[in-house]
Amino acid sequence: VVVMNKAIFIKDVFDYEKSQDWKYKGSKPAIIDLYADWCGPCRMVAPIMKELAKEYADKIVVYKVNVDKEKELAALFNATSIPLFVFIPMSGEPQLFRGAADKATYKKAIDDFLLKTE
């Protein structure tokens, strides 16, 4: 799990300062977990995301964004409620997943959306 700030986001994910048209820069699909330390459901999901990051280590990247520290990134994804997960496939638009869920739900989203082959 990579803790992300604006500089890392612009370098590794998407440079929204240069373009409004989504273009993912990463080499593997990704999940961005937008959270806050005070958020109970966020704390509940954190160990699940860590496990998934290990299980899928060679296939996806999992980033964490603290919305209290990275307000610009929170605003970019309209993170009005957390946890908020941004699932980023290699091509196509990212999909937002709001709220906490169980591990099986996240695994299904990873397998069906991020790792799906045409």
List PLM regions with ranges:
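A short glycine-leucine-enriched loop at secondary-structure breakpoints
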Residues: 43, 76-80
